[in-house]
Protein backbone atom coordinates (compact mmCIF):
# COMPACT_ATOMS: atom_id res chain seq x y z
CA UNK A 1 0.00 0.00 0.00
CA UNK A 2 1.19 3.48 -0.82
CA UNK A 3 1.86 6.10 1.82
CA UNK A 4 -0.86 8.33 0.36
CA UNK A 5 -3.43 5.53 0.71
CA UNK A 6 -2.36 4.89 4.32
CA UNK A 7 -2.75 8.60 5.18
CA UNK A 8 -6.20 8.75 3.56
CA UNK A 9 -7.29 5.59 5.36
CA UNK A 10 -6.18 7.00 8.73
CA UNK A 11 -7.94 10.28 8.01
CA UNK A 12 -11.12 8.40 7.01
CA UNK A 13 -10.97 6.29 10.19
CA UNK A 14 -10.58 9.42 12.31
CA UNK A 15 -13.55 11.14 10.60
CA UNK A 16 -15.72 8.04 11.12
CA UNK A 17 -14.74 7.97 14.80
CA UNK A 18 -15.67 11.66 15.21
CA UNK A 19 -19.00 11.06 13.43
CA UNK A 20 -19.79 8.17 15.78
CA UNK A 21 -19.03 10.33 18.83
CA UNK A 22 -21.24 13.12 17.48
CA UNK A 23 -24.10 10.65 16.87
CA UNK A 24 -23.80 9.33 20.41
CA UNK A 25 -23.80 12.84 21.87
CA UNK A 26 -26.87 13.77 19.80
CA UNK A 27 -28.71 10.64 20.99
CA UNK A 28 -27.85 11.38 24.64
CA UNK A 29 -29.03 14.97 24.20
CA UNK A 30 -32.34 13.86 22.66
CA UNK A 31 -32.99 11.19 25.31
CA UNK A 32 -32.20 13.64 28.12
CA UNK A 33 -34.58 16.20 26.61
CA UNK A 34 -37.35 13.59 26.43
CA UNK A 35 -36.52 12.47 29.98
CA UNK A 36 -37.09 16.03 31.20
CA UNK A 37 -40.67 15.83 29.84
CA UNK A 38 -41.68 12.67 31.72
CA UNK A 39 -40.64 9.29 33.05
CA UNK A 40 -42.69 6.92 30.85
CA UNK A 41 -41.40 5.96 27.39
CA UNK A 42 -43.65 3.97 25.04
CA UNK A 43 -42.18 2.81 21.73
CA UNK A 44 -42.51 0.29 18.95
CA UNK A 45 -39.98 -2.56 18.78
CA UNK A 46 -36.62 -2.05 17.07
CA UNK A 47 -36.91 -3.16 13.47
CA UNK A 48 -33.86 -1.87 11.61
CA UNK A 49 -33.57 -5.18 9.73
CA UNK A 50 -37.10 -4.76 8.35
CA UNK A 51 -36.28 -1.23 7.20
CA UNK A 52 -33.18 -2.45 5.36
CA UNK A 53 -35.02 -5.20 3.47
CA UNK A 54 -35.46 -4.88 -0.26
CA UNK A 55 -39.04 -4.58 -1.52
CA UNK A 56 -40.51 -7.90 -2.64
CA UNK A 57 -42.13 -6.48 -5.76
CA UNK A 58 -41.14 -3.72 -8.16
CA UNK A 59 -37.85 -2.40 -9.46
CA UNK A 60 -37.13 0.04 -6.66
CA UNK A 61 -33.96 -0.77 -4.83
CA UNK A 62 -34.23 2.14 -2.45
CA UNK A 63 -34.25 1.14 1.20
CA UNK A 64 -33.08 2.63 4.45
CA UNK A 65 -29.41 1.96 5.11
CA UNK A 66 -27.17 4.95 5.64
CA UNK A 67 -30.00 6.98 7.17
CA UNK A 68 -30.44 4.26 9.81
CA UNK A 69 -26.72 4.39 10.55
CA UNK A 70 -26.84 8.17 10.86
CA UNK A 71 -29.80 8.16 13.27
CA UNK A 72 -29.01 5.07 15.37
CA UNK A 73 -32.57 4.05 16.33
CA UNK A 74 -31.37 0.97 18.21
CA UNK A 75 -28.88 2.96 20.28
CA UNK A 76 -31.54 5.61 20.93
CA UNK A 77 -33.96 3.00 22.25
CA UNK A 78 -31.33 1.29 24.39
CA UNK A 79 -30.43 4.65 25.98
CA UNK A 80 -34.12 5.41 26.55
CA UNK A 81 -34.56 1.99 28.17
CA UNK A 82 -31.63 2.73 30.47
CA UNK A 83 -32.72 6.25 31.47
CA UNK A 84 -36.52 6.07 31.74
CA UNK A 85 -38.21 4.75 34.87
CA UNK A 86 -40.97 3.02 32.85
CA UNK A 87 -40.05 1.73 29.38
CA UNK A 88 -42.82 0.01 27.41
CA UNK A 89 -42.26 -1.70 24.08
CA UNK A 90 -45.61 -2.37 22.41
CA UNK A 91 -46.15 -5.68 20.57
CA UNK A 92 -45.85 -5.93 16.78
CA UNK A 93 -49.63 -6.25 16.36
CA UNK A 94 -50.19 -2.79 17.91
CA UNK A 95 -49.87 -1.07 14.47
CA UNK A 96 -50.18 2.52 15.68
CA UNK A 97 -49.78 4.01 12.20
CA UNK A 98 -52.69 1.97 10.81
CA UNK A 99 -55.33 2.19 13.56
CA UNK A 100 -58.32 4.54 13.30
CA UNK A 101 -59.97 5.05 16.69
CA UNK A 102 -63.13 6.58 15.16
CA UNK A 103 -64.03 3.38 13.30
CA UNK A 104 -62.08 0.93 15.52
CA UNK A 105 -60.35 -0.71 12.53
CA UNK A 106 -56.91 -0.95 10.95
CA UNK A 107 -56.47 0.79 7.58
CA UNK A 108 -53.16 0.26 5.75
CA UNK A 109 -51.62 3.45 4.36
CA UNK A 110 -48.64 3.99 2.10
CA UNK A 111 -45.46 5.37 3.65
CA UNK A 112 -45.75 8.56 1.59
CA UNK A 113 -49.23 9.34 2.95
CA UNK A 114 -48.24 11.64 5.83
CA UNK A 115 -51.55 13.50 6.22
CA UNK A 116 -54.79 11.54 6.07
CA UNK A 117 -58.44 11.68 7.06
CA UNK A 118 -59.95 9.51 9.75
CA UNK A 119 -63.32 7.87 9.07
CA UNK A 120 -65.13 10.84 10.69
CA UNK A 121 -63.37 13.29 8.31
CA UNK A 122 -60.78 14.65 10.75
CA UNK A 123 -57.41 15.38 9.07
CA UNK A 124 -54.44 14.12 11.12
CA UNK A 125 -50.68 14.02 10.65
CA UNK A 126 -49.53 10.40 10.65
CA UNK A 127 -46.57 10.64 13.04
CA UNK A 128 -48.37 12.82 15.58
CA UNK A 129 -51.42 10.55 15.49
CA UNK A 130 -49.24 7.44 15.91
CA UNK A 131 -47.57 8.96 18.96
CA UNK A 132 -51.04 9.78 20.33
CA UNK A 133 -52.07 6.13 19.89
CA UNK A 134 -48.89 5.02 21.68
CA UNK A 135 -49.88 7.41 24.48
CA UNK A 136 -53.29 5.67 24.64
CA UNK A 137 -51.84 2.25 25.46
CA UNK A 138 -53.39 0.19 28.24
CA UNK A 139 -50.27 -0.80 30.19
CA UNK A 140 -51.92 -3.93 31.60
CA UNK A 141 -53.03 -5.48 28.29
CA UNK A 142 -50.63 -3.71 25.85
CA UNK A 143 -53.62 -2.90 23.62
CA UNK A 144 -55.05 0.42 22.45
CA UNK A 145 -57.42 1.85 25.06
CA UNK A 146 -60.31 3.09 22.89
CA UNK A 147 -61.98 4.99 25.77
CA UNK A 148 -58.77 6.91 26.46
CA UNK A 149 -58.50 7.68 22.72
CA UNK A 150 -62.02 9.12 22.65
CA UNK A 151 -61.54 11.21 25.82
CA UNK A 152 -58.06 12.54 24.95
CA UNK A 153 -58.41 13.05 21.17
CA UNK A 154 -59.77 16.62 21.27
CA UNK A 155 -56.79 17.76 23.35
CA UNK A 156 -54.36 15.96 21.02
CA UNK A 157 -56.06 17.36 17.91
CA UNK A 158 -55.82 20.90 19.31
CA UNK A 159 -52.12 20.36 20.10
CA UNK A 160 -51.52 18.95 16.61
CA UNK A 161 -53.14 21.96 14.93
CA UNK A 162 -51.17 24.38 17.13
CA UNK A 163 -47.93 22.56 16.26
CA UNK A 164 -48.67 22.60 12.53
CA UNK A 165 -49.64 26.29 12.70
CA UNK A 166 -46.39 27.09 14.57
CA UNK A 167 -44.35 25.21 11.93
CA UNK A 168 -46.09 27.05 9.09
CA UNK A 169 -45.88 30.52 10.72
CA UNK A 170 -42.17 30.18 11.47
CA UNK A 171 -41.39 28.62 8.06
CA UNK A 172 -39.82 25.53 9.66
CA UNK A 173 -39.19 22.82 7.10
CA UNK A 174 -39.89 19.40 8.60
CA UNK A 175 -38.76 16.73 6.14
CA UNK A 176 -41.23 13.96 5.24
CA UNK A 177 -43.99 15.31 7.48
CA UNK A 178 -46.56 16.27 4.86
CA UNK A 179 -46.81 19.75 6.40
CA UNK A 180 -46.75 22.39 3.65
CA UNK A 181 -44.65 25.50 4.30
CA UNK A 182 -45.33 28.46 1.98
Language-model regions: role of each:
Residues 1-182:
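Positively charged, helix-rich recognition surfaces that bind polyanionic ligands
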